[in-house]
């Protein structure tokens, strides 16, 4: 073989090897500005009764779908950098889904903001169905000891008490190790400031009629509004005046009087836990998490109705589901859009620490 022919063959072989190497390189991860976290959908993704996800699918430019080994596929607006996730119901599913997304090599989530936008039960002492609450404290309602109330000492108010303590609300409790998480105060206050004057939907006659039953609670009868209020997450869907009293005291106990129980659902401590672990390995920034919960039902019955009667009635359909889903979309969208529009600043500096005059 001539020297010239040998050189030609070497060049061809090198070109082939380089093309193989290029083909083997994974694509660059897609940078995501905002992840919207929803928990469930009622039926199809579009065109029927809406759960937490459907309005995002119908109203946003989520043109790109990514198969996802979770509850549902992932949907992306590639122009705005908006990714929407459905975790499934419960802390176990939310923790698993968030961890799976956080480790997904297809996405760069290092600068992403995470906005939980879901429905919840609401304390009638604080707000009405359709209202929207931004949480600063997430308190876990599962990590505890429990004795059946029929077997507890006479001077105990509840059978629930913190691990490694001797009675309910024992002041000698250990530091929280999953029982309570605090979000970024500045970011939460900023989100509330952007949305506190929004007029929320209030067109559902059934929701209005149900609100009117809560004659002992002034805030429960108000038209929907935006507030700040803290959250209990538990795998048990609890209901009733006594459990509502426990939730208020539980939040007060773990936040040392700084928090106020307002909403109850089943996922957010799992979401925070996974983000906190992903934060340790540099995959996300947990200080960029926001939790918005909108009221689909009350956490206790109105006067003259038992807890069992009210819960069973709600199981047939939440009295405020439609307006809660709409409120979640409208309030969360306001914050999502602000984050995207202000990305030149918010990519590297959290809104709560930004002088608003510096924004474009």
Regions found by a protein language model. Give the residues of each.
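Generic secretory/membrane-interface signal
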Residues: 2-3, 19, 262
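Bacterial N-terminal signal peptides that target proteins for export
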Residues: 2-11
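Hydrophobic h-region of N-terminal signal peptides that target proteins for export
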Residues: 15-23
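Accessory terminal and edge-of-domain segments that mediate assembly/interaction
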Residues: 25-360
């Amino acid at each position: 073989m001539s020297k010239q022919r040998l050189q030609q063959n070497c060049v061809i072989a090198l070109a082939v090897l380089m093309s193989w190497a290029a083909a083997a390189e994974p694509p660059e991860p897609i940078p995501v500005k905002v992840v919207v976290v929803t928990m469930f959908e009622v039926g199809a993704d579009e065109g029927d009764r809406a759960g937490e996800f459907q309005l995002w699918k119908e109203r946003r430019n989520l043109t790109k779908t990514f198969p996802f080994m979770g509850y549902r596929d992932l949907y992306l607006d590639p122009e705005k950098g908006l990714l929407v996730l459905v975790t499934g119901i419960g802390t176990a599913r939310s923790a698993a889904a968030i961890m799976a997304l956080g480790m997904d090599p297809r996405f760069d989530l290092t600068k992403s903001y995470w906005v939980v936008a879901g429905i919840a039960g609401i304390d009638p002492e604080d707000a009405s169905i359709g209202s929207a609450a931004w949480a600063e404290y997430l308190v876990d309602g599962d990590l505890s000891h429990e004795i059946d109330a029929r077997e507890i000492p006479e001077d105990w108010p509840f059978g629930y008490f913190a691990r490694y303590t001797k009675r309910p609300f024992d002041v000698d409790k250990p530091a929280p190790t999953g029982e309570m998480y605090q979000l970024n105060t500045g970011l939460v206050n900023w989100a509330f400031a952007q949305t506190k004057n929004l007029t929320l939907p209030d067109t559902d006659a059934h929701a209005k009629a149900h609100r009117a039953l809560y004659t002992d609670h002034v805030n429960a009868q108000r038209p929907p509004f935006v507030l700040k209020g803290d959250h209990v997450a538990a795998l048990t869907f609890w209901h009733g005046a006594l459990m509502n009293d426990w939730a208020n005291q539980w939040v007060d106990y773990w936040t040392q009087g700084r928090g106020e129980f307002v909403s109850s659902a089943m996922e957010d401590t799992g979401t925070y836990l996974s983000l906190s672990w992903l934060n340790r390995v540099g995959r996300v920034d947990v200080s960029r998490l926001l939790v918005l919960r909108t009221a689909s039902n009350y956490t206790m019955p109105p006067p003259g109705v038992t807890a069992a009667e009210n819960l069973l009635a709600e199981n047939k359909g939440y009295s405020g589901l439609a307006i809660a889903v709409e409120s979640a979309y409208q309030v969360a969208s306001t914050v999502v859009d602000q984050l995207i529009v202000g990305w030149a600043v918010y990519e590297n500096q959290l809104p709560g620490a930004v002088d608003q005059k510096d924004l474009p």
